[in-house]
C-alpha cells in the first residue's frame, strides 16, 4: 500500500504540492499612507518523461512487493512441510512401536504357556515379560513424541490435523519465487534509474501573482503577473543520484545471478537426494520382507520346540530393526519429494 500510494503523486497534474504566499509592505516614514500587498500562487511542473518514469517506479515497486510476498509464502510452505513430515515420522515410529508391543505380548503368551508346561525354564518367561515391558515403554515414549509433533503442527496451522493431508507427488514448478523476486528487484532498480535520468533538475515552478498598491498621492493600482522559475541542471546534483541508481542495478543484478545459482544447486541436490532416498526405501522394503519371513520361520520353530527363546528374540530383534529402518526410509523418500517441490518453488 505504501508503494502503491506513490501513484497518487504520479497521476496528479502537478509534480508536487502547490504553494500560496503573500506579503504586505508599508511606509515607515511620513504619514504611512503607502501600502503594498502581494498574493502569489504557484505549482511545480512535470519534467518531460518524469511522470511516466515515476509511474514506472510505482508499478515495479508493487510488483516487487508481490513477488516478495510469494517468496515468503514459499518459505512458510517449507516450514509447514517440515512440521508435517516431523509429525508423520513420529506417527510412523509410534505405529512400529505398537507392532512391537503386539508381537511381544504374543510371544510372551507362548513362552508363558510353554513355561507352565515345563518345556522351557521360568527364566525365559521372565525374559519375555521383560521384553514386553520394554516394548510398552518404547511405545509410550513414541506415542508421546507423536502427540507433541502433532500439537506443534496444529499450532502452526491453526488447528489442522496432519491426517487431513496426503503425501504430495513431485511436480514441475514454474518460475521459482526467489528468481521472480530477484528479477522484480532488478526491474525496480532499472525503473529508478530511468526516473533519475528523467529528472536532471528540480521541477520548474509556474505561478501567478497579484499586487495591490495603495498610495494617497499617486493613486491606487492593481497588477497581475506570471512567475516562472527553472532550476538548472548541475553535475553536483546529478552525479551522486546516477551513481546510486547504477550501484543499485549492479547490486540487484548480482543478487539475481546468485539466486539463479542457488536455486539450480538446491534443485539438483534435492533431486539427487530423492533418487538416493527411493533406492534406500526399496532396499529397506526388501530387507523387511526377508526379516518377516525369517521371523515367521523362527516363531514356528519355537512353537514346535525346535528353537529356544533367545534365538527367537534375536530373530525378532532383526525384524524390529528392519521395520524401523523401512518406516524411516519410506518417510524419508516421501519427504524427499516434498523437498524437491520446495526446491522447485512449488507451493502446496
PLM regions and their residue ranges:
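Short flexible linkers and secondary-structure junctions
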Residues: 1-86, 91-101, 105-108, 122, ...
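Acidic, low-complexity, intrinsically disordered peripheral segments
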Residues: 325-348
Amino acid at each position: 500500500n505504501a508503494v502503491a500510494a506513490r501513484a497518487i503523486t504520479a497521476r496528479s497534474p502537478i509534480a508536487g504540492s502547490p504553494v500560496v504566499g503573500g506579503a504586505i509592505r508599508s511606509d515607515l516614514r511620513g504619514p504611512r499612507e503607502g501600502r503594498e500587498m502581494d498574493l502569489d500562487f504557484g505549482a511545480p511542473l512535470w519534467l518531460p518523461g518524469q511522470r511516466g518514469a515515476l509511474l514506472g517506479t510505482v508499478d515495479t515497486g508493487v510488483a516487487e512487493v508481490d513477488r516478495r510476498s510469494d517468496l515468503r509464502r514459499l518459505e512458510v510452505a517449507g516450514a509447514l512441510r517440515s512440521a508435517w513430515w516431523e509429525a508423520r515420522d513420529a506417527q510412523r515410529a509410534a505405529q512400529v512401536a505398537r507392532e512391537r508391543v503386539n508381537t511381544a505380548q504374543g510371544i510372551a503368551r507362548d513362552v508363558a504357556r510353554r513355561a507352565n508346561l515345563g518345556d522351557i525354564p521360568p527364566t525365559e518367561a521372565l525374559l519375555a515379560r521383560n521384553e514386553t515391558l520394554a516394548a510398552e515403554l518404547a511405545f509410550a515414549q513414541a506415542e508421546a513424541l507423536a502427540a507433541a509433533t502433532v500439537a506443534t503442527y496444529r499450532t502452526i496451522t491453526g488447528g489442522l490435523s496432519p491426517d487431513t493431508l496426503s503425501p504430495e507427488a513431485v511436480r514441475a514448478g514454474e518460475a521459482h519465487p526467489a528468481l521472480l523476486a530477484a528479477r522484480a528487484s532488478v526491474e525496480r532498480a532499472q525503473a529508478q534509474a530511468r526516473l533519475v535520468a528523467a529528472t536532471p533538475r528540480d521541477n520548474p515552478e509556474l505561478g501567478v501573482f497579484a499586487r495591490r498598491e495603495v498610495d494617497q498621492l499617486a493613486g491606487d493600482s492593481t497588477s497581475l503577473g506570471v512567475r516562472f522559475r527553472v532550476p538548472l541542471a548541475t553535475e553536483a546534483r546529478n552525479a551522486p543520484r546516477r551513481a546510486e541508481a547504477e550501484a543499485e542495478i549492479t547490486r540487484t543484478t548480482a543478487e539475481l545471478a546468485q539466486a539463479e545459482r542457488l536455486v539450480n544447486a538446491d534443485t539438483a541436490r534435492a533431486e539427487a537426494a530423492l533418487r538416493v532416498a527411493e533406492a534406500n526405501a526399496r532396499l529397506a522394503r526388501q530387507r523387511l520382507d526377508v526379516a518377516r519371513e525369517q521371523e515367521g520361520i523362527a516363531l514356528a520353530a519355537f512353537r514346535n520346540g525346535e528353537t529356544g527363546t533367545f534365538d527367537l528374540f534375536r530373530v525378532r530383534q532383526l525384524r524390529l530393526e528392519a521395520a524401523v529402518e523401512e518406516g524411516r526410509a519410506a518417510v524419508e523418500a516421501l519427504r524427499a519429494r516434498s523437498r524437491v517441490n520446495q526446491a522447485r518453488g512449488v507451493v502446496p
